[in-house]
Amino acid sequence: DRFFQAAGIMLLEGYGLTETGPVLSVRKQQHPVIGTVGPLLEDIEHRVVDQNGVLLPPGKKGTLYVKSPQIMEGYYKRPDLTEQVLNDGWLNTGDIAVFTVNGEFRILGRSKETIVLLGGENIEPVPIEDKLNASEAILQSMVVGQDQKFLAALIVPDMNKLEEYAIKMGINYVQNEELLSNPEIEEYVHDEIQSLVNTRNGFKHFECIYRFTLLSSQFEVGRELTHTMKIRREKVSQLYHREILKLFI
């Protein structure tokens, strides 16, 4: 934003979903507020709620719900998916938003687990992660790819299995970091991923993992995991922001 502003180029950023027709908001040309996607268009109601469904005031971030005649009636022949996102006309966008007192708002990330690729494909990461974690070489994983062309993954490997493989293949190393960056180890994990997540096992081609990075630390409760052992995706995305960026360069 500030780069284009310094160059004298006005950006009128907007926001919307395929399910919403699609445009919900756009910055006003007369008063473009940097860092926002503008105010909502006319006839669009909104709510920002916390994880318990409690309505939040401006300045507080939460999940954005919208209601309008332009909202879809449902997913074609998928009442199960429709029921997950639509309730009494209110659509759960799955996005985390915060509104200003003047009505503009910012999108801060995702609240739902669903990943939406650049091409519009909706992907549920948990079945993919469950399959990855079935590998004896993988302890934990998190699939990433929001607004990207393909999926990638953060992989927490089982170091004992990697060490066994290194001994078997005659791979020399001093520290774990050397082992994790070894091309033969990367190929070993790559082959594990490809053998599990593929079209033969019922996954669509866009659900396959095209890139990955190996992490040296396990996900921990209170940090990357909730007390029920679910991944805190927003937190993990923050902690491993650089690693995720490199996956899509």
Where are these regions (language model features)?
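Generic structural signal for well-ordered beta-strand positions
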Residues: 56-57, 106, 123, 226, ...
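Conserved C-terminal "lid"/linker of ANL adenylate-forming enzymes
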Residues: 115, 140-142, 190-249
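Ser/Thr-glycine-rich phosphate-binding loops at phosphate-binding pockets of nucleotides
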Residues: 17-20, 93, 226-228
